[in-house]
Regions:
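General marker for long, soluble alpha-helical cores
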Residues: 1-169
Length: 169
């Protein structure tokens, strides 16, 4: 998703406008009516950001992957945040998945404070987000008396629709 403030302008007539992020620039040609727009777009990757990623050991070979990083608003600060939190070997596919699934720095920080960080691989973080496991869900299990439940069992409980109300029955 995009914040309205990211757009260079929202035209009411057929027009061209851009959104620029570290991964690149999306140029859109179209029209907005109210809060909805339609049209066509082109994406131009940012070669400097691509070079930065390569220096970080993340080799991007397809423009599509750069566009996915753009859509997830993945930037230098985000990559540095991952590395500062112990994720040294970040693959292109994991970085793309983190962006696609909306694992922002705030979401990750929440996971780090809620769950035992040593078990939180990038794959596990993505799995938590996909299945909607969060601090509130873990707290509801704790409040129902289920305190030292292993992370994988918490995920499985969420997948199978087990919640505090179910546990109270």
């Amino acid at each position: 998703t995009f914040d309205k403030k990211e757009f260079s302008a929202l035209p009411t007539t057929e027009s061209e406008f851009t959104i620029t992020r570290e991964a690149g620039t999306m140029t859109m040609k179209g029209k907005f009516e109210g809060n909805e727009g339609y049209g066509k777009f082109t994406f131009t990757e940012n070669a400097d950001f691509k070079t930065f990623l390569a220096k970080e050991g993340i080799e991007i070979t397809k423009e599509h992957d750069m566009m996915m990083l753009f859509m997830g608003n993945i930037n230098r600060d985000y990559v540095a945040f991952l590395k500062q939190n112990g994720y040294k070997d970040i693959s292109k596919s994991k970085l793309v998945e983190l962006g696609i699934h909306g694992l922002t720095k705030d979401v990750l920080t929440n996971y780090f404070s809620t769950f035992d960080k040593k078990g939180l691989t990038l794959s596990k973080l993505i799995e938590l987000k996909i299945h909607g496991v969060n601090a509130q869900y873990k707290k509801s299990l704790n409040d129902a008396g289920f305190i030292d439940v292993p992370l994988q069992q918490i995920i499985e409980a969420k997948i199978h629709g087990i919640n505090a109300e179910y546990l109270a029955d």
